[in-house]
C-alpha cells in the first residue's frame, strides 16, 4: 500500500476527533524502531477511524508508525515482560508478523481491544447489515400492527345491513325509502300551493302516511275523482236535507201569516 506521507501526517496532527488514545508499550512492530532491551518502547497511540498512529510522546509532531486496521484481528497475547497486559494485531496476509502491544492495566487493555476490533470497514459493514435487518423487521412489525388495528377499527365501524323488508298495504303499495312522515309532509307542503282547500283537508297527515290515492275511511278509493264523488254524495244529501228543512220552515211561516 502506498500512502502520501505528508497527507497522512497532516491528518494525524489535525484537529479531527480521535476515537481513542493513550500510552501503549510496543515490541518491534511495523515501522517501530527496535529497542535494545526486551521491555519494549512506550509510545503515545492515537486511533482515528481505521488508522492507528504512534508518536514519540503526547506532544510529538511527527508520527513514528501507522497501522491500517483492515484484514486483521485483535487477540490477547503474552507479553515478553511479566505483568504486562498485552494484545496483538494479527494480519491475514502471509509473511506479516503480528503487532504486539501492551496496555498499562486490564481496563485499558479491554478498552483498546474493543475499539481496535471495531475500527475496520469490515466491521462497519456487518453493523450496517445488522441495522438494516433490524429496520426491515421493525417496518414489517409496524405494518402488521397497522393492518391489525385497521381491521379492528373496520370491524367496530362496520355498518349494519339495511332492512329491505317493507310493510305492504292493502292495495299492494308500500312505503319507499323517502316515505317517512317528515318526507311525506315536506312533499305535501311543496305541492299544497297548487291544491284546493278541500283537497288539502282531505289529504291530512293520516292520509299522507297511507300513500297517494288512499283514504283512511274508504281504502278502496284509488283516485281523487272517486274520492271527490264519494264525499260529494254525503254533501249532496246534507244539502237536500237542508233545503227540505228550509222549505218546511218557509211554508210554516206563510201559513202563520195568512188571516
UniProtKB/Swiss-Prot annotation:
Principal subcellular localization: other
Location within or outside the cell: Early endosome; Recycling endosome; Golgi apparatus, trans-Golgi network; Cytoplasmic vesicle, Clathrin-coated vesicle
Disulphides: none
One GO MF term attached to the UniProt entry: protein homodimerization activity
Keywords for the protein's UniProt record, in alphabetical order: Coiled coil, Cytoplasmic vesicle, Endosome, Golgi apparatus
Coiled coil: 124-149
PH domain: residues covered: 17-121
Motif (F&H): 223-235
Record's keyword annotation contains Coiled coil: yes
One of the protein's GO biological processes: receptor recycling
Superkingdom per UniProt: Eukaryota
Family under the similarity heading: Belongs to the sesquipedalian family.
Subunit structure: Forms homodimers and heterodimers with PHETA1. Interacts with OCRL and INPP5B.
Alphabetized PANTHER family for the sequence: SESQUIPEDALIAN (PTHR22902), SESQUIPEDALIAN-2 (PTHR22902:SF15)
Recorded domain comment: The F&H motif, an approximately 12-13 amino-acid sequence centered around Phe and His residues, is essential for binding to OCRL and INPP5B.
Misc: Was named after 'sesquipedalian', an unnecessarily long description of a simple thing.
Protein name: Sesquipedalian-2
